[in-house]
Amino acid sequence: MASENSPLLAYRLLGEEGAAFPPNGAGGSGVASARKLSTFLGVVVPTVLSMFSIVVFLRIGFVVGHAGLLQALAMLLVAYVILALTVLSVCAIATNGAVRGGGAYFMISRTLGPEVGGSIGLMFYLANVCGCAVSLLGLVESILDVFGADVTGSSGIKVLPQGYGWNLLYGSLLLGLVGGVCALGAGLYARASFLTFLLVSGSLASVLVSFVAVGPRNITLAPRPGTNGSSVPPRHGHFTGFNGSTLKDNLGAGYAEDYTTGAMMTFASVFAVLFNGCTGIMAGANMSGELKDPSRAIPLGTIIAVAYTFFIYILLFFLSSFTCDRALLQGDYGFFRDISLWPPLVLIGIYATALSASMSSLIGASRILHALAQDDLFGVILAPAKVVSGGGNPWGAVLYSWGLVQLVLLAGKLNTLAAVVTVFYLVAYAAVDLSCLSLEWASAPNFRPTFSLFSWHTCLLGVASCLLMMFLISPGAAGGSLLLMGLLSALLTARGGPSSWGYVSQALLFHQVRKYLLRLDVRKEHVKFWRPQLLLLVGNPRGALPLLRLANQLKKGGLYVLGHVTLGDLDSLPSDPVQPQYGAWLSLVDLAQVKAFVDLTLSPSVRQGAQHLLRISGLGGMKPNTLVLGFYDDAPPQDHFLTDPAFSEPAEGTREGGSPALSTLFPPPRAPGSPRALSPQDYVATVADALKMNKNVVLARACGALPPERLSRGSGSSAQLHHVDVWPLNLLRPRGGPGYVDVCGLFLLQMATILSMVPAWHSARLRIFLCLGPREAPGAAEGRLRALLSQLRIRAEVQEVVWGEGAEAGEPEEEEGDFVNGGRGDEEAEALACSANALVRAQQGRGTGGGPGGPEGRDGEEGPTTALTFLYLPRPPADPARYPRYLALLETLSRDLGPTLLIHGVTPVTCTDL
């Protein structure tokens, strides 16, 4: 664990070569010595080659011929704006900290979490695998177009046999060459890429020179079959040289049929082809594990590559529009060979771009796979991809990826996969934009990238534009990719992943919660919108598990805080003993499946600790208004962890993932007769303190006897029928009259109604008991109570019970806070409590047809039993010396009643107005 003595930056000052570098942590792709690629070789070259691909040689005429120069420029501008928005996000994330192996996957997973990062990382990996196969098959087709034995026309060199098997053989041989280069390390790949870059640059240079040096000429176009299979006369295209009329004719759009597919072209279809060839901006980021300084190389190299390719595309668009008529542009997409000073150099460029694209895809895929394997998100299935050479090259991931590409090559034609590959790339780009957007919106102080040319507007536009392009290119593939991402995320969520990466969702939640808490003004509170906000004080959760779940049901969308007081004095301790306990309490909340916060404190006494928690728990307008305590009696505590499946498994004491079981983190329950941390005097004083602070109080007794189905999270419709009994009258002051409608009585009704709204208690019948004196006529008081319940929208049965004649005799009522100190003696108070207890017990087993009756009247119809009883809690006496007697009276009152809640409310909680 980090302390103030830990170094702020874990940097090794001197490496083997005397240079400073950070250690390569988890998720890296090798030892530090593997980081040797410069910005140019590691980022610029692979990104340029990936963004050019084969489009730069074979699709310039296609785009300009169908869309015209103006629309082609608009398409290019829109495409590069979309890419540039993602590049800005990449630059921001890459300059905000150390970037290890995995490129885009590393950025996404360390921001959005392992679930989203792992799912998109796997999709990005599969996109690179399929992209490698598509490039190789495109290269095979380009070679066979010139050297194939079945080539039509006289220009071909018919030396290579053709067919499915031969095509697979050629693709496999080329894959072996590409895989060998990647398996031997990033250094050889960089040199091979640089050689390819030189070949492509030389080929493009020859094309640019040819536009100027070659004179006008007629070019015979490939013949097209007639409508009925008849031959048509050969057509000709014209290379006019620089000509104003040619440019004028090429300015507007002229969409026609694609001679290779016969499909009618539209703006969307042409734009999709152009954009498909430009989606290579992550080629450099995928090499992050081999870069000397990825935080500098990735943004700088990517921006240079994007600017360079944009300039070349613009130049080629203008030159083609100035010099080639529309017939040539639409009838021969490979017209560069026809106008070149040396046509074989164009072929070399075509082959070099296809080969470099396949190499870039394969090595990028291997680095993503290695990072996924290092993070252990998919278990043993990716274990072989962890293997690295002595120099840090992940040859295991290369071999793994090579095998998958070989399987994809078996499918032969992959034109249908091209759109899926592009959509998967766009999903990854959108995720990078979303990662940067999340970091920006979270406003975390540690998000301070050195690259500042971005904002949340650019990130949001990047996400929206990538999603739009996905559905423009292929709606089916876009919908399928989002569905696949959701399924993979659900799988990783169920499996569980690393939690030490940090979740930007937590930062976003903090930002939003803080904003809305500041808007939650306690001065605007109204009784119409009152809700319970509970503070449950727990000594040992082993004995309080049923109460913990019952309180969760009582909160009804309100605040629920689990409070615990650790006894001690910080002055006499070397460190705070409370902080290490938070993890165990949070695990308790998770396993008990309750929606609660945890608040712990250190105090010399439980009473003082309770005062601390009552004052400081919560935040802003979300502060506890009700204190919940277990009842103070002599019942031996039970260990509910032993009987609850969520806490008793696994028996070995370890949970899945190797963390200790919760049963090992809390001490065993107190043994019978052992000293308690809280005295009876302090217990009652804590209740009195809460009432002085204007907090409602709930004392819970015998909650361990609650029916298990009533504490479940499901519906209680199929459970055994039970009653919930409410006695909204102070049974220790049983005078008739309107006592049942005081604030405390209404609070009892409100809490019982809240409980009945919980699904597990829907089937329980709410009964409200109305006590009558022996000389009171039944019916009148019941009518008033029913009218009140109707106004409060409370559905309940009302039952009248007759209180014994001696209970009402005697002096007028004392003040509520001094009921023990009045004329009534201890013996009389004890007798009154016993009589009230007998009355309540007599009604617990009665059905709805019992009618009025006293303790002796048990001749009514037997019905459902009482699952929970709500009793009026009298206010503690003013004299602390009377506290033990007060507690004894409460014990007598609630003895043998089963699960009971004694409640005292001090705040209005009901409203009859709209």
UniProtKB/Swiss-Prot annotation:
**Transmembrane segment boundaries:** 37-57, 73-93, 120-140, 168-188, 194-214, 263-283, 298-318, 339-359, 377-399, 417-437, 467-487, 741-761
In which family does this protein belong, per the annotation? Belongs to the SLC12A transporter family.
Annotated region described as Disordered, given as residue ranges: 645-678, 843-864
Gene that produces this protein: Slc12a9
| Biased composition regions of type Gly residues, renumbered to the chain | 846-855
List UniProt keywords, sorted A-Z: Cell membrane, Glycoprotein, Lysosome, Membrane, Phosphoprotein, Transmembrane, Transmembrane helix, Transport
| Phosphoserine PTM sites in chain numbering | 6
User: What protein am I looking at?
Assistant: Solute carrier family 12 member 9
Q: Which residues lie on this side of the membrane: Extracellular?
A: 58-72, 141-167, 215-262, 319-338, 400-416, 488-740
Quote the function comment for this protein.
May be an inhibitor of SLC12A1. Seems to correspond to a subunit of a multimeric transport system and thus, additional subunits may be required for its function. May play a role in lysosomal ion flux and osmoregulation.
Q: Which residues lie on this side of the membrane: Cytoplasmic?
A: 1-36, 94-119, 189-193, 284-297, 360-376, 438-466, 762-914
What membrane topology does the UniProt entry give? Answer: Multi-pass membrane protein
Gene Ontology MF, one: potassium:chloride symporter activity
Location(s) in or outside the cell: Cell membrane; Lysosome membrane
Which Gene Ontology cellular component terms are annotated? lysosomal membrane; plasma membrane
List the GO biological process terms. cell volume homeostasis; chloride ion homeostasis; chloride transmembrane transport; potassium ion homeostasis
List all annotated glycosylation positions: 218, 228, 243
**Xref: Pfam families:** AA_permease, SLC12
> Which species expresses this protein natively?
Rattus norvegicus (Rat)
- So which domain of life are we looking at? Eukaryota
Q: What does the subunit section of this Swiss-Prot or TrEMBL entry state? A: Interacts with SLC12A1.
